[in-house]
Design a protein with these regions (language model features):
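C-terminal cap of metal-dependent C-N hydrolases
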Residues: 19, 381-438
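Active-site gating loops and adjacent loop-to-helix segments of metal-dependent hydrolytic enzymes
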Residues: 74-113, 158-179, 242-267, 292, ...
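Acidic, glycine-enriched loop/beta-strand segments at the rims
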Residues: 15-28, 41, 303-305, 365-404
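His/Asp/Glu-enriched, well-ordered alpha-helical/loop segment
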Residues: 262-269, 310-391, 407-409
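Alpha-helical scaffold segments that flank or form the walls of functional sites
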Residues: 77-152, 184-200, 442-447
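Metal-coordinating catalytic core of metallo-dependent amide/deamination hydrolases
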Residues: 145-275
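N-terminal metal-binding scaffold of metallo-dependent hydrolase/deaminase domains
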Residues: 1-46, 57-59
């Protein structure tokens, strides 16, 4: 059981806040937290039950990661780099992730599922994430339990499928089987009834039809209507591979973006993951409808595909950064987004540090309708990520935002507070046995890796 929040004062050598609607960096200020809210930001030391007064911290709003996959990332880790697992199809979604995640969840005990969930949440918190949206198969409800137990602000997004058994054959053609839509929506509703709003609203749900090629028209319409009825975010993978685009064209004579628009799904409430195979016309359509793109550059770079943050922004789309299924490293994604954007645009002025920081703070909060997140100001939720800027690779320091994007890494995360609770200090989770969690999670993943079908998938 986590302790209740207490009055806390944290000193920042630099504090990222706002002035007249824009980012502002304050020098040598204190952030005072009372309960679950920020009470004040002041240059003078306030009274508090807990005082964190060490200099050399850069205080940021708690970082927001709107697209992450704990389980599939661990499944693929060190097995799918350098082209492994994708010889018969460019996307490991259909060769590794979908078949092995389903097989693994059928195989696991509840304890093993919880071990995997805890390991993922631990990595996220230690990496500076305060809020995470996590699409996952509904056979892993332990993601909710692990987030609640370890203090993460969590938007669980259990998948809905019309065809849950999409898998690429030896010829590279994806074949779709199953009809799980009604059952998945019922399971989503059950999870919503159990978890929505737990711990003062820290645990929430998002609707998550898996992708345009695995969800038929009826399911997409029904899921979207349900999300709008409940006022929860709606997220889906869109045009994440050439195969998906070809499938939707063959079925419906449309692109994935046009398909969603035809169904009434494309709108300001839609969080569209990846979109790497969207045309310029598709992106213009999405911008007109007000959709948000969830950009995850490193997972596509691993496959030799460009996913440029600046490209989506140039089409007028609100674009935020997520980790997807690669390394759960949000700071690493910011640097990758900067490098990939600048090199593909042949311009040093795109994807600036302030823009990228907004993509994991203010813009991400706006995408889910949370004006109390992604900002350090009185009245906002007490979610804080602090970077230790005293390391040799961060000194001397002139502009802390540029240092965060270009020089820092997740090992520099010093403090993470969520909902007024100090969870991470000195880079370690205060309420978790990190060694035990790591060992148990690794053992559970190893159980899947040992399966003959897993070894064949990784070699394919």
């Amino acid at each position: 059981m986590l302790p209740e929040p207490r009055t806390t004062a944290i000193f920042g050598s630099y504090v990222l806040t706002e002035a007249e609607g824009a980012q502002a960096v304050l020098r040598d200020h204190w952030v005072l937290i009372e309960g679950r809210r920020i009470a004040a930001i002041t240059p003078t030391r306030p009274e508090a039950a807990l005082v964190l007064d060490r200099p050399g911290r850069f205080l940021l709003p708690g970082l927001i990661n709107l697209h992450n996959h704990c389980f599939s990332e661990m499944l693929a880790r060190t097995h799918t780099e350098d082209g492994a697992g994708r010889k018969n199809n460019k996307s490991i979604v259909y060769t590794v992730l979908m078949p092995l995640s389903r097989r693994g969840l059928d195989l696991y005990t509840p304890e093993e599922r919880m071990a995997v969930a805890r390991l993922g949440v631990l990595q996220l918190l230690k990496g500076g994430n305060a809020t995470v949206m996590e699409p996952f198969r509904n056979g892993l409800p332990e993601m909710f339990a692990a987030a609640e137990e370890m203090g993460l602000r969590f938007y669980g997004a259990p998948y809905l499928f019309s065809t849950a058994d999409a898998q690429a054959g030896a010829d590279g053609v994806v074949r779709y089987a199953g009809d799980d839509g009604a059952a998945d929506l019922a399971a989503w509703n059950d999870l919503h009834a159990t978890w929505e709003g737990r711990d003062h609203g820290r645990i929430r749900l998002a609707m998550s039809p898996h992708a345009t090629d695995t969800c038929g028209p009826d399911l997409l319409r029904t899921a979207t209507a349900r999300a709008r009825e409940l006022g929860v975010p709606n997220t889906i993978h869109v045009a994440q591979s050439p195969g998906e685009v070809a499938t939707i064209r063959a079925r419906h004579g449309r692109t994935p973006a046009e398909y969603l628009d035809w169904l009434g799904v494309l709108g300001p409430d839609l969080l569209a993951a990846h979109c790497v195979d969207c045309s310029g016309d598709d992106l213009a359509l999405m911008a007109r409808r007000g959709a948000t793109v969830l950009n995850c550059p490193r997972v596509f770079a691993r496959a030799g595909t460009v996913a440029s943050f600046a490209h989506f922004r140039a089409h007028g789309l609100r674009t935020v950064i997520g980790t997807d299924g690669y390394n759960l490293d949000l700071l690493g994604e910011l640097q990758a987004a900067a490098i990939i954007s600048k090199t593909t645009a042949a311009s040093a002025t795109v994807a600036t540090a302030p823009e990228l920081i907004d993509a994991v703070t203010r813009d991400a909060a706006a995408a889910i309708g949370r004006d109390d997140l992604g900002t350090l100001r009185p009245g906002a939720a007490a979610d804080i990520t602090a970077i230790d800027i005293g390391h040799p690779h961060l000194q001397p320091l002139f502009e802390p935002r540029r240092a965060l994007v270009w020089l820092a890494n997740r090992a520099d995360v010093d403090v993470v507070m969520v909902d007024g609770r100090l969870l991470v200090e000195g880079g370690r989770h205060l309420f978790a046995d990190e060694a035990a969690i790591t060992a148990a999670g690794a053992a559970a993943i190893g159980k899947i890796w040992a399966l003959p079908e897993a070894q064949a998938a990784f070699a394919g």
